[in-house]
Amino acid sequence: NSGNCDNSGSVVYQGEILTYHQDPVEAVNVSLINNNETISSMNTVDNGKYVLVIPDEPGQRYTIQPKRLDLARNGVSTLDLVRIQKHLLGKELFDSPYQYIAADANNNEQVSAIDLIEIRKLILGIYTEFPANESWRFVDKNYQMANPQHPWPFDDVINLQYEGISVSGLDFIGVKVGDVNNSA
């Protein structure tokens, strides 16, 4: 969705970050990147929204990249371990591609017993963060997953060509790694 917005003559890119249950994700650092350099950034507010002011430089390509690296244990509990184990045993399969992403604690694009071990180490305090993954992953809301039972690889950034107009609807789904029951 694009459209002109009156923001003091500035061009802005804006969107929101929600969980797959439509809860807003606050405190996500959203960066505007050009040629591997951060041009500007902001943290999402309590409703999960962000607005980035874009430099008036025609022809530039920009990347919008969300990151949240804090509170790795938030929302992660033994209930998540039980849920992943039931999935692995075929007793209660995941019903969302985002649960697969959340369960992939070691970031190897599959869900296995190794992920259970990694999540258990986080719960027990052996880890303060996942060694091979970030505490939150973000998926472009408009990304069409070819196989919801194997959602990898997925678009975790949005790339745009600057056209001199404001763009809204640059939305992401936030996935808390380890939190398959979405309690964070």
Regions found by a protein language model. Name each.
Residues S2-A184:
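Cellulosome-associated attachment modules in secreted, modular CAZymes
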